[in-house]
Amino acid sequence: MDTRIKRIIAREILDSRGNPTVEVDITLNNGIRGRAACPSGASTGIHEAVERRDGEKRFGGKGVQGAVQAVMDIISPKLLGRDALEQKSIDSVMIELDGTPNKAKLGANAILTVSMAVARAAANSEDVLLSEYLGPKSTLMPVPCMNIMNGGAHANWQGSDFQEYMIAPVGAPDYPEAVRWGCEVYHSLKSVLKKKGLSTGVGDEGGFAPIVPSNLEPASLIVHAIEEAGYIPGKDIALVLDPASSGFYKDGKYTLKTEKKVLTSEEMTDYYEDMIRTYPIISIEDGLAEDDWEGFAFMTKRLGNTIQIVGDDIFVTNPERIHRGLKEKTANAVLIKLNQIGTVTETIDAIRLAQKAGWGTMVSHRSGETCDSFIADLTVALGCGQLKTGAPCRGERVEKYNQLLRINEFLGDKARYAGRQAFNSA
């Protein structure tokens, strides 16, 4: 079978927020095709690889025709005739073509989408699942961390200061049951909110986004919903937080508008410690801001033996920044987002670097998503054990959970559910 690249086509499509994004189709000489679409974040770290947007009147400046043309006019001529099975070589060519440290010239949205489409075309050509192609011996199914209450930028700052309140069915016996448990709690929470006269409208990621009096209230509501659904908080289902603290960090302080508090890094750590004592929290992501290295190290030293401390914006899936984090003991886990670094190869390198050091790895969607389920396969392939991809609501979120159900079915008796052990220090 001739797996050399014959044709590359890029186009502008819409993401889940109605904003343009890049989609790429790759056809190999054997006639096999691969398609991929790029996600986009709402709360983006300043150190992330750069999305290329047109900045013109159409789509309010968010068009991606320039990124599409970069694929067609610059990337495609250099990749035609190359073997799709040589992922690392293809990604290296695109990185060299761009020539910037953050992919600002061609755009991470152009480069990544091609990189993903190449991997999918290669997997299709080998007639295997993408997860099997990227990780032939991997059988670990992840804990689905479902974002069932939204705040911060994901809810237009109408509710909690904290961006995501997730549930993690750590006590489930397998992945399909974990999904069922999560769905039942999600529907239970909707009933709880209705009874309290709170809004059941959903945010970008499918979670509910009611106006609440404090950042603790969503956790209380979720614990109530877990109990109403017939599960034991902490034992069956734990809580996972992503405050996305860079969004309320300014001049060295953290401003919690919901509670009219202005706190230092140490005081924020105290705040989280109090939350952990009250609620069954197993993991906190971006509890402090993206450049608060000293604060992160303090928080990890203080809380890292009790819960998982995840770095997202501080690491941006970048091996160089993860290296620094390992040296300074900044966290004990890293969030993985494909479009933060911009190629499949670099993403895999970041995951393996963290795993080799004993850190936890949680793969993540973005708030502006498509129905591409690449991250579901990636999570299993690399044995990450944790995936967050929104609530069990909205098609672009549910598609990832559904793809994992298919992978679990394919693995059969070989499938192993990660459970509580996936979370560092939990």
Curated annotation (Swiss-Prot):
Q: Per the record, what is one GO cellular component?
A: extracellular region
Q: Which residues does Mg(2+) bind?
A: 242, 285, 312
InterPro entries given for it? Enolase, Enolase-like_C_sf, Enolase-like_N, Enolase_C, Enolase_CS, Enolase_N
Its pathway? Carbohydrate degradation; glycolysis; pyruvate from D-glyceraldehyde 3-phosphate: step 4/5
One of its GO biological process terms is:
glycolytic process
Q: What is its main location?
A: cytoplasm
Q: Which residues bind (2R)-2-phosphoglycerate?
A: 163, 337, 366-367, 388
Q: Where is the active site?
A: 205, 337
Q: What Gene3D superfamilies does this protein's entry cite?
A: Enolase-like C-terminal domain, Enolase-like, N-terminal domain
Q: Which PROSITE patterns match?
A: ENOLASE
Question: SMART domains under this entry?
Answer: Enolase_C (SM01192), Enolase_N (SM01193)
Kindly give the CDD domains that the UniProt entry links to this protein: enolase
What is stated as this protein's family in its record? Answer: Belongs to the enolase family.
The UniProt function text for this chain reads: Catalyzes the reversible conversion of 2-phosphoglycerate (2-PG) into phosphoenolpyruvate (PEP). It is essential for the degradation of carbohydrates via glycolysis.
Q: What is this protein called?
A: Enolase 2
Native organism is Methanospirillum hungatei JF-1 (strain ATCC 27890 / DSM 864 / NBRC 100397 / JF-1)
Lineage here is: Archaea, Methanobacteriati, Methanobacteriota, Stenosarchaea group, Methanomicrobia
